[in-house]
UniProtKB/Swiss-Prot annotation:
Protein name: Iron oxidase
Taxonomy, superkingdom: Bacteria
Subcellular location: Periplasm
Taxonomy of the source species: Bacteria, Pseudomonadati, Pseudomonadota, Acidithiobacillia, Acidithiobacillales
UniProt keywords, alphabetically: 4Fe-4S, Electron transport, Iron, Iron-sulfur, Metal-binding, Oxidoreductase, Periplasm, Signal, Transport
Assigned GO CC terms: periplasmic space
């Protein structure tokens, strides 16, 4: 195979971009993709009612006082913790 045969043509690149954009649009319309805020089951994020060291829900950027979260579904403890923990910025 020659060097010229290995090159991607502009037509091929545009076709590939169109396929990717179409796939993303179709996936979005089907409702597949990023979960809605507050819809992840506790088990999926390994939620626990106790803190992990100094990390706990009340100091997490995802926490919505008094007992909600942008990621985890249902009521949560301000002293809880999960793998979605993101410390609040100072």
């Amino acid at each position: 195979m020659s060097e010229k045969d290995k090159m991607i043509t502009r037509r091929d690149a545009l076709r590939n971009i169109a396929v990717v954009v179409g796939s993303v649009a179709t996936t979005t319309m089907m409702g597949v993709g990023v979960a809605d805020a507050g819809s992840m089951p506790k088990a999926a994020v390994q939620y626990q009612d106790t803190p992990k060291g100094k990390d706990h829900c009340s100091v997490c950027a995802q926490f919505i006082a008094p007992h909600s979260c942008k990621v985890v579904a249902g009521n949560i403890s301000p002293n809880g913790w999960c793998v979605a923990f993101v410390p609040k910025s100072a």
